[in-house]
Amino acid sequence: MVTLSSPSVIAGGRDIDSTGYAWWSGNARLINLSGKLLGAHVAHAGLIVFWAGAMTLFEVAHFVPEKPMYEQGIILLSHLATLGWGVGPGGEVVDTFPYFVVGVLHLISSAVLGLGGIYHALRGPESLEEYSTFFSQDWKDKNQMTNIIGYHLILLGLGAFLLVFKAMFFGGVYDTWAPGGGDVRIISNPTLNPAVIFGYLLKSPFGGDGWIVSVDNLEDVIGGHIWIGLICISGGIWHILTKPFGWVRRAFIWNGEAYLSYSLGALSLMGFIASTMVWYNNTVYPSEFFGPTAAEASQSQAFTFLVRDQRLGANIGSAQGPTGLGKYLMRSPTGEIIFGGETMRFWDFRGPWLEPLRGPNGLDLDKLTNDIQPWQARRAAEYMTHAPLGSLNSVGGVATEINSVNFVSPRAWLATSHFVLAFFFLVGHLWHAGRARAAAAGFEKGIDRATEPVLAMRDLD
């Protein structure tokens, strides 16, 4: 009987003799079989889209409208809400039907991708070159490889413009900075000034500078997507119409494993950026859906106690804390009035519930005394008890014995998962880059297949 481990398997692309890899080596067997490799990737895309659709429907089925999303372990509906679907003023979910539609559309498209993957894995041509030179994937064909880069860049650019169109023409997106506590709005005047957009890339990543993570308005976000969309599409056209220059041909390694390493390196970089963005940024990741940032929870606790004690008669402008510094208010290193106590370390935090209470010199004592709105006090109290922290001691003054059962902030979960995955992708990038460079230099022979353990194992049946 023929089995996956049987030496009698003679199907091309599936045995050691024809590929140099055992069955458990996965897609490595398909390096030189572009049709089969396409099938594997299309099927993989189908699995990803299936998870997105199924998990969206799972979250819809379990969603409780009376509770905030971040208290329900939700990580997908929060993204859809950020895009302006199903939410109203203050981030309140008013309709879950759009989420249901998105989930079903993903399930349907996953079925199409799954069928495409099965077709190309089992029935389609083993090598796409047999069908058309347009789909050629000869790893050493430098011009074709840059053509493929061009197609991908154009698709990425169109993806960036999808967000632009949604924000500008198709209902808008959720803006946590909208007056009164956030709302969905049309972004009618995106920032196109290159000095502003590319200025983010020149900023320091440290402290209050924050590189691109410091973006705090949707005009800059959408304007940035316009720029990146134009750059990606222009770059795609450039790569399709031109051939790589001599220095490019000499500088890069041109084989399948090298391209894998380049891709893993890019994904790793994007993962690290996404991790820091979701942890620190409350504009692109609104706290109404993802929960407060660590700095936000800390500042909201100081604000909550200020509101409480002021109602009890405390003079918040002059009360001293146990260290002799201001108990409720103090000065920042640059002279602004900031919250006192341990949260002083987060003095440069900005949030939509706090900014209306600032003046030209930081927090405005008159506004704190007379202008605090009920929604600001409620939101701060909610954020104070849902810090994205897992510490048993206080962090920034926040008592992190969190006032919820089994609460894990989606912000903490997403930041951690993206950081861990980015790290492993970086390791994969280094591993495959090293192998590709060694192979190109001629001294990497790989594992000796004659002594491969699987060859000494019994057949699976």
UniProtKB/Swiss-Prot annotation:
It is found in: Cellular thylakoid membrane. Keywords: Chlorophyll, Chromophore, Manganese, Membrane, Metal-binding, Photosynthesis, Photosystem II, Thylakoid, Transmembrane, Transmembrane helix. It is a multi-pass membrane protein. GO terms for cellular component: photosystem II; plasma membrane-derived thylakoid membrane. One of its GO terms (molecular function) is electron transporter, transferring electrons within the cyclic electron transport pathway of photosynthesis activity. [CaMn4O5] cluster binds at E355. Binds multiple chlorophylls and provides some of the ligands for the Ca-4Mn-5O cluster of the oxygen-evolving complex. It may also provide a ligand for a Cl- that is required for oxygen evolution. PSII binds additional chlorophylls, carotenoids and specific lipids. One of its GO terms (biological process) is photosynthetic electron transport in photosystem II. Pfam families: PSII. The keyword Transmembrane helix applies. The chain crosses the membrane at residues 57-81, 122-143, 166-188, 243-263, 279-300, 435-459. It comes from the Bacteria. One of the components of the core complex of photosystem II (PSII). It binds chlorophyll and helps catalyze the primary light-induced photochemical processes of PSII. PSII is a light-driven water:plastoquinone oxidoreductase, using light energy to abstract electrons from H(2)O, generating O(2) and a proton gradient subsequently used for ATP formation. Belongs to the PsbB/PsbC family. PsbC subfamily. PSII is composed of 1 copy each of membrane proteins PsbA, PsbB, PsbC, PsbD, PsbE, PsbF, PsbH, PsbI, PsbJ, PsbK, PsbL, PsbM, PsbT, PsbX, PsbY, PsbZ, Psb30/Ycf12, peripheral proteins PsbO, CyanoQ (PsbQ), PsbU, PsbV and a large number of cofactors. It forms dimeric complexes. This is Photosystem II CP43 reaction center protein.
